[in-house]
Amino acid sequence: MKLSALSIIFGMILVMTIMYTKAEAEAEAEADADADAKAEAEAFWGTLAKWALKAIPAAMGMKQNK
């Protein structure tokens, strides 16, 4: 009987450890995906701002020359 109870306890600990490890890995993957999405958005807006800073003065110069 004692061996059977110990086996059940060991099995429960093993399952809990696996579930915890899986949850931790999923949380880490989600955090990485969020960081990648944020970096991608920042890169997009940064590129757009650089383009606008170059295009606006050029467009204003074209209006003044006419």
UniProtKB/Swiss-Prot annotation:
Propeptide part(s) removed at maturation, as residue ranges: 24-43
Gene Ontology, cellular component aspect:
extracellular region; membrane; other organism cell membrane
What is the tissue localization of expression for this protein?
Answer: Expressed by the venom gland.
Report which superkingdom the organism of origin falls in.
Answer: Eukaryota
Q: Which UniProt keywords apply?
A: Antimicrobial, Membrane, Pharmaceutical, Secreted, Signal, Target cell membrane, Target membrane
What InterPro entries does the record point to? Antimicrobial_4 (IPR012523), Pilosulin (IPR049518)
Q: Where is this protein found?
A: Secreted; Target cell membrane
- Please cite one Gene Ontology biological process associated with this protein: defense response to other organism
Record's Pfam families? Antimicrobial_4, Pilosulin
Leader sequence segment: 1-23
Give the family, as the similarity comment puts it: Belongs to the non-disulfide-bridged peptide (NDBP) superfamily. Medium-length antimicrobial peptide (group 3) family. Ponericin-W subfamily.
- What protein does this entry describe? M-poneratoxin-Dq3a
